[in-house]
Amino acid sequence: VSTRPDCIHESYLEVLREAQGKYGTNITVELGLQSVNPHTLLKIGRCHTVAEFIDAALQIGRYHFDLCAHIIADLPWDDRIDVEEAAKLVSVLPVTEIKIHSLYIIKGTKLAKMYEKGDIKLLPPEEYAERVVLILSMLRPDIVVQRIVGRASANTLSVNGGRPWWEVKEYIEKLMRNRHIQQGSACNYLHGAAVRRFLHE
């Protein structure tokens, strides 16, 4: 079930639980976080807040459904600190899966008009790859990574800097190999990190 964070309500989750019991199937809820920067969320017209994502994730966690979070790694208004915080936020919540993708500029949208006028400066694929590597390094190791680069439909003006999706994917994997980075290799901020550092001194 793919939906928005501000559309999660206990009554809907009860329906899903009943369906799960009736049909004996696993249920995954997909939520778009996209960014932890409130100014960016306004820019792209998400009309939900980070707090609403947290609330929705906690509600879903109470029902023990799988939860897949979506993050856009190359939003022009986000910096690497925002991207790192997105990975951390996902990791402290009951998120079981993640999809990472780049910004799609769809024809006929407000973003498309801004792009065509030159009001948006998109990040190059190399920066997208750097941000994905950062996310993966900060991500909790047990979260299933379903996607690290997306493919777009024909009505898309721009995605992945015009590069083929597989080329971007291979570049990300190359960066991780060359730098000896694995998922969760920098996930050292959970479970009282400051106390652990003090105890180990």
Where are these regions (language model features)?
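Conserved SAM/AdoMet-binding glycine-rich loop
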Residues: 1-50, 54-56, 61-62
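Short, internal active-site loops enriched in acidic
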Residues: 4-8, 76, 150-155
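Generic domain-boundary/flexible-linker signal
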Residues: 10-12, 40, 80, 109, ...
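Short glycine/serine/threonine-biased micro-segments
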Residues: 30, 72, 116
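Surface-exposed cleft-lining segments at the edges of enzyme active sites
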Residues: 39-46, 72-75, 119
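Short, solvent-exposed loop/turn segments at secondary-structure boundaries
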Residues: 43-46, 79-81, 159
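Conserved C-terminal portion of the radical SAM core fold
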Residues: 51-110, 126-151
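Auxiliary Fe-S-binding modules of radical SAM enzymes
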Residues: 97, 104-201
